[in-house]
């Protein structure tokens, strides 16, 4: 008897439990560690270059402007914090894309009871990189023209009244696409087929996308929510597809 479907919040809660299990933690920690190291390195370089610039620039100013050194540093720190806040999640998604497909595959093995502690394989991960990056490019190709249309709509008098709710609805829909596409891609489901399936499960997809959208808005917490959303989307795939959700080994035959 197939397991019952869940609501969006239930899927995310179960996804969080899955990624915190001992057998899957490594698949979460690795991309997160890479992202943190990358940002720490970039921040270090930015601080070093800014310090050199201040040391070069300040001596050229009149003495009465020396107080600027006490203003420039706080401004720089504020700028760095804003940069991290607005770009960390975006960069994390790009870096994590191959890992997310890999994580989804391992989560599915655990869900199906095939393997409670799947092995990590660099060769398997590297083999997935071209396909997952191509799929990410396909998502951008779907998202950007629609964002442009909404952006233009936002400046049209009267019509712009509906722009805000449409932006929200589109953001929720893109969250469903972003994460449910990982298990769909692992099963070699074509892009249009995947979209068609999500549309056939429109309310379930929007429920899932909505809770993920809200969770990813929370700073720091969103770092854990990204892999949790991958696991939740994989569970969504297995539960909602029912008998059609063949194990990956069969899907690839």
UniProtKB/Swiss-Prot annotation:
Give me any GO biological process, just one.
Answer: cysteine biosynthetic process
GO molecular function terms attached to this record:
high-affinity sulfate:proton symporter activity
Asked if the Swiss-Prot or TrEMBL record annotates the protein with the keyword Heme, the reply is no
Localization in the cell? Cell inner membrane
- Sorted UniProt keywords: Amino-acid biosynthesis, Cell inner membrane, Cell membrane, Cysteine biosynthesis, Membrane, Sulfate transport, Transmembrane, Transmembrane helix, Transport
- State the GO CC annotations: plasma membrane
Q: Which residues cross the membrane?
A: 27-47, 71-91, 150-170, 211-231
Please give one Pfam family short name: EI24
Identify its membrane topology class. Answer: Multi-pass membrane protein
Q: Which HAMAP family match?
A: CysZ
State the family named in the UniProt similarity comment for this chain.
Belongs to the CysZ family.
- Could you tell me which PANTHER family the record lists for this protein? SULFATE TRANSPORTER CYSZ
Functional note? High affinity, high specificity proton-dependent sulfate transporter, which mediates sulfate uptake. Provides the sulfur source for the cysteine synthesis pathway.
Checking NCBIfam families in the record gives: PRK04949.1
Instruction: Tell me the protein's name.
Output: Sulfate transporter CysZ
Point out the gene that encodes the protein.
cysZ
